[in-house]
Each structure stands twice: as C-alpha cells, then as structure tokens.
C-alpha cells in the first residue's frame, strides 16, 4: 500500500514541471472596461477601471477534519477607492450619479461577498442588460 502511494506521488511530481510551464498569471492589477447602467437612466456607459485578476495558490486537503478547514483563496482587492460617474439622461427624481471601484492593490484572500463577485462564472464586466433584445 505504501509503495503504491509513493509511486503515485512520484508520478504526480514528475508532472510538476509541465504544469509550471503553463504559467498562470498571478493575482495582479488589470485594466478593464466595465459597463455602468442604472434604472431610470438611459443607455449603457462603458468606463475604464482597474480590477484584480489572476491565480491564487490554494490547498484542498484529502483528509478533512474540523481542524483543517479548506479555505479557497481568490484574487481580491487590497486597497481601492471609488470613482463617480454621472449619467447624462435620467428621469426626474432619479439620482444620476453611480460609483464604481478602482483597485489600487490586489491580494489573495477569502472572497468578501460584500465587495466581490464570488460566483464560479459570472457575467463579463462589460456586459450591458440594455444589449439584450426585449421580446413581448
């Protein structure tokens, strides 16, 4: 049994150089176009911002206990500030101003659902709901 485990282990380590050659980009700042929309305001406006994107090393133990909880790290904001955008045409009574984040630094950590999209696969950042045809 031990020999089988060591054999499998050495087989996996022999694949390590091939995996390292793939070179996933580490968690870093990335310039990105995002879309801004607001109910009561016309159009979809694309703006440039800086987001966090990339790979974070993580571990998932084979033998799980209450002492070794697996925490999956994601690339998330370190420091950020918010910019404002004013929509040119909004119906009366609607505040035309929206804010969006601009990343100043990135880090690998737990996903904060209050500030990040923690889903497996989400909409692209420049996606506009206004671009979807509406059928009656």
UniProtKB/Swiss-Prot annotation:
Cellular location(s): Secreted
Glycan attachment positions: 31
Classification via Pfam families: Cys_knot (PF00007)
Record GO cellular component, one term: extracellular space
Residue pairs linked by disulfide bridges in the UniProt entry: 27-75, 41-90, 44-128, 52-106, 56-108, 111-118
BP terms from Gene Ontology: G protein-coupled receptor signaling pathway; ovulation
Main location (coarse class): secreted
InterPro entries assigned to the protein according to its UniProt record, in alphabetical order: Cystine-knot_cytokine, Glyco_hormone_CN, Gonadotropin_bsu, Gonadotropin_bsu_CS
SUPFAM superfamilies with a match to the protein in the record: Cystine-knot cytokines
PROSITE patterns: GLYCO_HORMONE_BETA_1 (PS00261), GLYCO_HORMONE_BETA_2 (PS00689)
Keyword Transmembrane helix appears in the UniProt entry: no
Function, as annotated: Involved in gametogenesis and steroidogenesis.
Family listed: Belongs to the glycoprotein hormones subunit beta family.
Subunit structure: Heterodimer of an alpha and a beta chain.
Protein name stated in the entry: Gonadotropin subunit beta-2
Organismal lineage: Eukaryota, Metazoa, Chordata, Craniata, Vertebrata
């Amino acid at each position: 049994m031990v020999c089988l485990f060591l054999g499998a282990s050495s087989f996996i380590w022999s694949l390590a150089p091939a995996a390292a050659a793939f070179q996933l980009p580490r968690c870093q700042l990335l310039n990105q176009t995002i879309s801004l929309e607001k109910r009561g305001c016309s159009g979809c406006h694309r703006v440039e911002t800086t987001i966090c994107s990339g790979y974070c090393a993580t571990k998932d133990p084979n033998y799980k206990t209450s002492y070794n909880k697996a925490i999956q790290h994601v690339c998330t904001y370190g420091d950020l500030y918010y910019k404002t955008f004013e929509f040119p045409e909004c119906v009366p009574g609607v505040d035309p101003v929206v804010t969006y984040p601009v990343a100043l630094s990135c880090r690998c950590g737990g996903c904060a659902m209050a500030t990040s999209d923690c889903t497996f696969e989400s909409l692209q950042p420049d996606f506009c709901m206004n671009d979807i045809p509406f059928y009656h």
